[in-house]
Amino acid sequence: MTMTLKRLALCVVCTFISICIQAQDVTREWVEQHYTKREVMIPMRDGVKLFTSIYEPVDATKPTPVIMQRTPYQASPYGEGYSYNLWNKLRNYARERYVIVLQDVRGRWMSEGEFVDVRPFIANKQSNKDVDEASDTYDTAEWLINNVKSNGNIGVLGTSYPGFYATMAALSGHPAIKAVAPQAPVTDWWMGDDYHHHGVLMITDMLNFVAQSFGRPRPVPTKTQTRMKPFFQDDEYSFFLREKTLKNITKIVGDSIAFWKDLMAHPDYDAFWQARDARRNIKDVKPAILLTGGLFDAEDCYGTWGVYKALKQQSPQTQTQFIMGPWFHGAWERDRGNHLGDIYFGANTSDFYLHEVEYNFFQYYLNGEGPKPDLDNHIYMFITGANEWKKFNQWPPKNSEPVNFYLQENGQLSNVVPQKANSFSQYTSDPNHPVPYTDEINKSKTREYMTHDQRFAERRPDVLTFRSEVLTEDVTLTGEIMADLQVAISTTDADFVVKVIDEFPEDFKYSQEIADKFNDGKPLTTIMGSYQMLVRGEVMRGRYRNSFEHPEGFKPGKVTQVKFALPDIAHCFQKGHRIVIQVQSTWFPLNDLNPQQFIDITQADEKDFIKSDIKIYHEKAHHSMITVNRLK
């Protein structure tokens, strides 16, 4: 079932006619006139009290629902000021006079207690000392039901880290929590969210996280917390290449960040990380769920897909809706969603989400108003390339089938198994000259790299590029991508990066009308002919090819399988385009450097980082490929 951009535009226009009539005055001044604010320390079962800002409508004639967000990022402003969220992303609920609740999670800002990053869920709580984010949500909900005038229904939402707390709210078991919307939820910080991908440390993101002072000692609740000074002033590539080792980075970070110590103490997927995988306890979920994510979310794309799959496998009875748009991290609540970098998606997809999807979800489950969710076709998926919304009843879609793309000699890519013997492509990976993830000079990672032009990488001798023939028809790929490489390396370890790329026709260019729409009228200087749009990319640390818990080295020169998953795809490679696969072993400084020896990377010295000669096989006996579903 397809929702074209024309239909989408019509929906957005109709929505705006109804929304704007009622919500055009939801400004700061309007909120301050129509809401009161009180600040409460809500007691938890173990005696710890959590700071909570409660915004209640002045006109409480009609009881309304509670909408809540729990956050480690401040339930500010503290005191008399009102949160800007009420006239921004929560404005629809302010218009409906919802009770709006913002809470500092345990151990953060004005809340008491000890903060624990992605605190593990305790499935079988034995006493009031067994507390987690789910129990804190339960206790908060219980207090709200007994102390705030409402209709008795509570909804919880949150993006990114607050998305993790939303997932925990869904596991709390409180009967008043009827609807939960985890958005780009942190789910597994080792396997694919934020700070690791398949065991590879996402070093740029991690250092930025540390600079936000997460995990620094906080003896007492506080309204202010000083951010650490930036670790470097020059560009990120130069800084991380100069420092190179995790030992050097540890010296810079210092000894006051508990979570950095945890990272260094747990390089493998051990019990520490497994306990922090939110998917493990997604079972028998009672509230309705609206799960939201971005196809180009550089931080928590993995977690969004992971929570959805866990819900369908472990809690199939849950009333679940799932939407993935052409968005970067959190774009649905703060951006137009019509482009990312040089790539244009068409209509304003974010307004469609806020007013047609999220708002209707909470109105139905909390207020008993609005259209009934279409649970038979519960998936809204934006197909990039085609730039259209489609609705599905399962993922991957029923009308899709697996297809293999085989790497071939001479840089070719096809659906035919290679027939030659002793056929491989080779490159040398040098940690002293790593492949950058972008050709731009930046102080920090940009969100646009997720669709960035990859032509710069093809020019590198340490990047292999395989391209299909020009497509004679549209090819829409959906679902998880499985990379299956047959490799031989000259050392005992290496990383493997696989990128799936959409290469535009040589004569492609945007019309001036389109260029003006997403470039704010500024001249579009990028040459779009033969543009290589990154659609998907993922890294795998070779030592984890057989087990994430128990790493093992390579035998130099031996042909070895390295198989790993890339995040799901929903992209149409249009007629006249090419499908391109790139393979490399560094992606810097997005990823930390591998010394390319089977040693403890956290303790590696600069002299330990050595070159590795890497062969990628494409022969009949050992063929490398990617497997993904193609929509019929």
Regions found by a protein language model. Name each.
Residues I343-G346, F352-V357, L366-K632:
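Glycine/threonine-rich phosphate-binding loop and adjacent beta-strand/alpha-helix elements that clamp
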Residues G81, N85, F121-N128, L157, ...:
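A catalytic-pocket lid/entrance helix-loop region that shapes and gates access to the active site
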